Regions:
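Conserved nucleotide-sugar donor-binding catalytic segment
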Residues: 135-208
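A conserved acidic beta->alpha catalytic loop
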Residues: 21, 36-45, 62
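Short beta-strand/loop segment that forms part of the nucleotide-sugar
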Residues: 29-38, 58-60
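Conserved donor NDP-sugar-binding/catalytic core segment of glycosyltransferases
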Residues: 96-123
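Glycine-rich, basic loop-to-helix element that forms the pyrophosphate-binding segment
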Residues: 60-77
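Short aromatic/hydrophobic "clamp" motif used to bind/position activated sugar donors
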Residues: 82
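Short, well-formed alpha-helical segments that are part of the catalytic scaffolds
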Residues: 11-24
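Acidic helix N-cap motif at the loop->helix transition within catalytic regions
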Residues: 14-16, 40-49, 94
């Protein structure tokens, strides 16, 4: 069984398109678990209108934040294979099939994507090439290549990643990726792009060619996050 976990917050503009791109690749026994963080723009109404039994919308809570919202969705999931998805992207055909194939011999998979603008016009054809994303514990400690919207994993990764870190600097995708690097097998799939990674003014993660511009956090905060990650991941087995 596959569980696709989505954290939503005021995603009314794009959530329907994303859900359709995901549902078209799932079987009748799979699920999409959505945790909403108190949207006020009708996001949950749009989700309910789709009326697909595979969608499980959790009761809305406020102020969990992106990481807490994703952890909540993951905790509610039931699948042996877990995908993470953002509310504003689009999955391209063949993504689920390719990830399942790679997960036969890996614990966590990251697939490449094309970076687009709000209208899905391609801005960068490959996020991997733009940032030099690849596996490697030290590499991803210094420059995180774990984008949740590009990740799929075995449930065993989630079990090893618990308990979830209380430090807010350790984001859900970075934490899961680093745990998989430390305790299992990770694969970055670079030969094809399987997601349209939509960037617009409302997205939390921005795209820049600068090393420390993945987010708007200060350089000091980013250094503190890396030190915290090094301490937390050291004892994971």
């Amino acid at each position: 069984m596959i569980s696709v976990c989505i954290a939503t917050y005021n995603g009314a503009a794009f959530i329907e398109e994303q859900l359709k791109s995901i549902l078209s690749q799932l079987s009748s026994v799979d699920e999409v678990v959505i945790s909403d963080d108190g949207s006020t723009d009708g996001t949950t109404d749009i989700i309910c209108r789709i009326k697909d039994e595979r969608i499980r919308l959790l009761p809305s809570y406020e102020s969990l934040g992106s990481t807490g919202n994703f952890f909540r969705a993951i905790d509610a999931s039931k699948g042996d294979i877990i995908f993470l998805a953002d509310q504003d992207d689009v999955w391209l055909s063949g993504r689920v099939e390719r990830c399942l194939k790679e997960l036969e011999t890996a614990d966590l998979v990251v697939t490449d994507c094309a970076v687009t603008d709000e209208g899905l016009n391609v801005v960068y054809p490959s996020l991997f090439r733009l940032y030099g994303l690849r596996q490697g514990l030290l590499h991803n400690l210094l420059r995180c290549g774990y984008y949740g919207s590009l990740m799929a994993m075995r449930r065993s990764v989630v079990e090893r990643a618990r308990p979830w870190p209380e430090n807010e600097l350790l984001k859900h995708d970075w934490w899961l990726g680093m745990v998989a690097e430390k305790t299992g097998r990770v694969r970055f799939v670079s030969d094809k792009q399987y997601v349209l990674y939509r960037r617009h003014e409302g997205t939390e993660t921005q795209v820049s060619k600068s090393l420390f511009k993945r987010s708007n956090r200060s350089l000091k905060t980013k250094i503190m996050a890396r030190l915290s990650m090094a301490r937390e991941i050291r004892n994971k087995r």
